[in-house]
A protein has these predicted regions:
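Short beta-alpha junctions and helix-cap segments that line functional grooves
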Residues: 144-147, 168-172, 185-187, 391-394, ...
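Mid-to-C-terminal polyanion-binding domains and interfaces
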Residues: 4, 17, 89, 93-97, ...
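A residue-level signal for conserved active-site and pocket-lining positions in enzyme catalytic cores
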Residues: 53, 160, 313, 503, ...
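Short gly/pro/ser/thr-enriched loop/turn and capping motifs at secondary-structure boundaries
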Residues: 137-139, 168, 188-193, 207-209, ...
């Protein structure tokens, strides 16, 4: 479901240039407003919520079903996935004959969740699979021949690769040569020539017509497990009738949120139902991590994406890559708490390292590019940076300078491992592939919004020039024409917990289903102050005296933060997202400030 394109020329609240140099526009054109009004009148949906739905492409007839998605109505027949039947049959054979199975996963949240899903399923039928997660630094992404040979030597007669393997020709051939079957379950792009596998289930195969290419790996694994369970039931396997697959949706939801796949169709149902499963705290590992993260209130996508995901990822970034999958497979609460404690420690270490690296990266970027205006691509590089954190740096730099950004970590030999993040409208992956073809990179690839690369230090200057020439014109045009789409206007008195609850029902929000942005027009900035060293806390006051608290995260040094800090007592327009904050056990409304402009 695509979000409607901006077709409205008139600036919302007449904001032509905001603090973040954006033009504010209404998300809805006249046809969209008419659709929202009809939706509200026909289905008795609050008008503001109807505007949110209409602004995200939901039709009038689909509104009620959208607000209550079900797995049953949105899940396709798993056999529509190419090779799903073959994969299910091979898994059933392994279960029926008690084979030694190994699971090879990726080192991110989706990889950990996919590995845990497969492990829990097979363990229910009495198998004890071995999980192998490669080291990010020493082994890199995906199966490698040495690891596959080792798993075969350990006795594995079947290796299931999850969230990887679609292009691992040499590694899968090594497993085949060792007499071990391989089943690949993945969602990454696939080449025209497939690696040697018993089954390769990937909705992004050219010959796959399932239409499920937007699923993360855990979402694909779940469909394979549905098919496998059906086959086991057909064969009257007694244990098959005691397994509730829906109870595993908490892990699927975690992966779906953290892998930032579009929250549409089956993905949205996965998250809605997975959040319900997560609130029961039946997964000892998730429960321990929620406790360690200080979760307050019901589990939300925010908790998955910003509290749980970073902690699981910390293991893969700077510590033991297998910690995340181990945590999600464990049933012993005391053991889960030990692993959760270690992941929390690693996350704090990662945060400290990131803070130092970010300060260095921003200083370099400011020296090289000033405020970034006019630059096509921000490229920063250091020798002492941790390669597991450069992706986070690139994301921060992209947000700070509003331009595509790369962070590159060089090792003592002069080889640099880099990661990049792009802005909407600029295809970073294509630019990186062009640099590979130009001989400037050892290797590189990616997609429109993110890319990875390996470069020799001797080519860094040439690479900067190549990127600048490739991107400057397009990027500066994109920045100059940047707009912020506003879903509607609310006053301080209208920002209520009831509104927050209604907005949550229209969620979850994420990629492909963006969080609603509301404008709070012409309110007096009653109070503004720094929170810590980076965040800006504000209190807005309406003419009737009602107030609304807000916070602009990591904005202190940015133009938005500087504007707010110097606008006390003035009337301003503020744009942001509305949510609930838990303070001393009490829920209260809080505006997450994204932009602002002075009111006439």
């Amino acid at each position: 479901m695509m979000e409607p394109a901006d077709t409205v020329a008139r600036a919302f609240l007449s904001v032509e240039r905001s603090a973040t140099e954006q033009r504010w526009v209404s998300r809805l054109d006249q046809a969209g407003q008419n659709r929202a009004l009809a939706m509200s009148q026909i289905h008795a949906i609050p008008e503001l919520i109807a505007r949110v739905l209409a602004g995200r492409g939901v039709g009038v007839d689909d509104a009620l079903a959208f607000l209550d998605p079900t797995i049953r109505s949105l899940m396709p027949d798993p056999h529509m996935l190419t090779d799903c039947e073959k994969a299910a049959e091979r898994l059933v054979r392994a279960i029926e004959t008690g084979e030694k199975v190994a699971i090879f996963g990726d080192y991110d949240v989706d990889g950990a969740a996919s590995s845990a899903l497969m492990y829990r399923f097979l363990a229910h039928f009495g198998l004890t699979p071995e999980i192998y997660i490669p080291d990010r630094i020493f082994e890199g992404y995906g199966p490698n021949p040495a690891a596959m040979q080792q798993l075969a030597a350990n006795g594995a007669t079947l290796i299931v690769t999850v969230d990887c393997g679609s292009t691992s020709h040499e590694s899968l051939q090594a497993a085949k040569d060792a007499g071990t079957d391989v089943v690949v379950i993945d969602h990454h792009q696939v080449g025209t020539e497939l690696p040697p596998a018993v089954a390769l289930v990937n909705p992004n195969r050219e010959d796959d017509l399932s239409g499920q290419g937007h699923l993360c790996a855990a979402g694909v694994v779940f469909l394979v497990l549905v098919a496998t369970l059906r086959l086991l039931k057909d064969r009257r396997n007694r244990q098959a009738f005691t397994l509730d697959l829906l109870s595993l949706l908490d892990i699927v939801a975690l992966a779906t949120v953290c892998d930032v796949v579009p929250l549409k169709g089956l993905n949205r149902a996965y998250v809605v139902k997975g959040l319900i499963a997560a609130r029961h705290m039946n997964n000892a590992g998730l429960a321990a991590l929620f406790k360690k993260a200080g979760l307050g209130g019901p589990v939300t996508p925010y908790h998955f994406g910003f509290l749980i995901g970073p902690r699981i990822n910390a293991g893969g970034r700077i510590g033991d890559a297998a910690l995340g999958s181990r945590l999600l497979t464990i049933d012993d609460s005391s053991q889960a708490e030990v692993i959760a404690e270690r992941l929390d420690e690693l996350n704090r270490e990662r945060q400290a390292m990131e803070a130092v690296m970010l300060a260095e990266a921003e200083a370099e970027a400011l020296f090289e590019y000033g405020d970034g205006s006019g630059a096509g691509v921000i490229v920063t590089a250091r020798e002492n940076w941790h390669p597991g954190i450069v992706g986070l740096l690139a994301s921060r730099l992209k947000d700070r300078f509003r331009r595509p950004a790369f962070a590159i970590a060089f090792d003592p030999s002069g080889k640099g491992t880099g990661s990049g993040r792009s802005i909407n409208g600029f295809d970073m992956g294509r630019m990186v592939r062009a640099a590979v073809e130009a001989g400037l990179l050892v290797k590189g690839g990616g997609h429109a919004m993110a890319a990875g690369l390996t470069v020799e230090r001797a080519n860094l200057g040439k690479l900067r020039t190549f990127f600048e020439e490739a991107a400057a014109k397009t990027v500066n045009e994109l920045v100059e024409s940047s707009v912020l789409k506003i879903d509607g206007a609310i006053g301080a008195s209208g920002a209520t917990l009831q509104l927050v609850d209604q907005l949550e029902q229209a969620g979850p929000y994420g990629s492909g289903h963006s969080q609603p942005i509301f404008a709070v027009p012409a309110h007096r900035l009653r109070d503004v102050r720094l929170v810590g060293t980076a965040h800006v806390k504000i209190t807005l006051e309406a003419m009737d005296g009602s107030r609304l608290d807000g916070i602009a995260f990591r904005a202190a040094e940015a133009p938005l933060g500087q504007m707010l800090l110097n606008a006390r007592g003035r009337n301003i327009h503020v744009a942001g997202t509305v949510g609930a904050d838990l303070w001393q056990g009490q829920r209260r409304v809080q505006l997450r400030v994204l932009d602002a402009a002075f009111a006439p």
